[in-house]
Amino acid sequence: MEELARESISLLGKSGLEGGTPSLSSMGAIFIMLKSALGAGLLNFPWAFNKVGGMHTAIMVELVSLIFLISGLVILGYASSLSKHSTYQGVVKDLCGPAIGKLCGICYIINLFMICVAFLRVVEDQLEKLCDSIHSNNTLYAMSEVSQSWYMDPRFAITVLCLVIILPLSIPKEISFQKYTSILGTLAACYLTVMIIIKYYVMEHPVLIKHEFSSNAASWASMFSVVPTICFGFQCHEACVTIYSSMKNKCLSNWAAVSVVSMLICLLIYSFTGIYGSLTFGEAVAADILMSYPGNDVAVIIARLLFTISIITIYPIILLLGRCVIQEAWLNHREKSLFVTLTYERCVRVVITVLWILVTLLIALFVPDISEVISVIGGISAFFIFIFPGLCLVCAVESEPMNTKAKSCLTAWGAISVVCGAFVFGQSTTIAVMEIIAKF
């Protein structure tokens, strides 16, 4: 995300966004790319690996997707160098025109909104396990059959959390005080990977271990079902333009190396998590891997707390990004008919914030599990990973002098990216909607 990227660059003392000299190193760029990509998406990988039909098929799909992921990053760096913009939307609008730029802005808001839904769904899952753990340890509960108290209901807990903690953190116009906690998502992801690997070897009584995965069982439909999870997990393309603009060495080959290294590290982390998580639980693996582990396991409780705290601190930043786009569009529209005061701006900010939190909370409360949310996010992510980079490449080569053969090859690759992105969006979104309807 662009705001996370800016804050990371600021923390490294490498800011090049305010007119200064860009001085972000390649290692710093890799670190920020990892920070932008690693997060709550990791929880869904073991489930996706099992659903796709086994580790071999899942890794093959990952490797094919990696070609497009890296290609999109390189294209966006190239497009940024041509447009001289430091934001994703600015690059798309400059190269592809205002109409595509508006579409990019709409997709950007929807993507941020659904990420917030996924975050709240993850928090609710963790609160459910924590409440169950506290409730099961109650000696009175062991002696009676009294139902769980209403205040131990995770839906009540997540509602209180949103109103008491997340809402006050999200209302301020500036939330720079939270930038030091944004690394918690990366820390939680790395901790989860190590924990899953260790648990695979030390667990004495795993739940329904199934090590048999038949490659023949993986149909084309099941193969494509893992793509939304990959798109959500590896998604850092919105931030990459800001990162590239802040780099000292903007050579395209250097940016390509940064993209390859960061994506390969993500590949290792996600693959190890998916492999060991699916091997541990087999078909019993939950859409949120932490839900498959016992509620009273200390190591798992630490992972739940890390993810919960990281989401609580990152949610307001994601909300800020979406709110800024909506608020800017609304205020620009109102300025044409009346003078906008500070009081009016404050009221608009509060209303957008409250509505954003309430709607995302309501959706998170009624969505069956995180897999459906990730399918929708993965479909929307296809615009940022496949479609917009492909369009930028097609538009860029038309304005750049180059030989006919190179122009034809690049145009063809851009068209392939757009077509693949449209397919991923349509397929994943349709399946997600159908699965949600079927569960209700």
Swiss-Prot record:
> Which InterPro entries does UniProt cross-reference here?
AA_transpt_TM (IPR013057)
- Tell where it localizes: Membrane
Per the record, membrane topology reads: Multi-pass membrane protein
Q: Name one GO cellular component term.
A: membrane
Q: Which Pfam families match?
A: Aa_trans (PF01490)
Which residues are listed as membrane-spanning?
A: 29-49, 58-78, 100-120, 156-176, 183-203, 223-243, 255-275, 300-320, 350-370, 373-393, 418-438
GO annotation, biological process: amino acid transport; sodium ion transport
Keyword set, alphabetical order:
Amino-acid transport, Ion transport, Membrane, Sodium, Sodium transport, Transmembrane, Transmembrane helix, Transport
Function field? Putative sodium-dependent amino acid/proton antiporter.
Family of this protein: Belongs to the amino acid/polyamine transporter 2 family.
Task: Supply the name of the protein.
Answer: Putative sodium-coupled neutral amino acid transporter 8
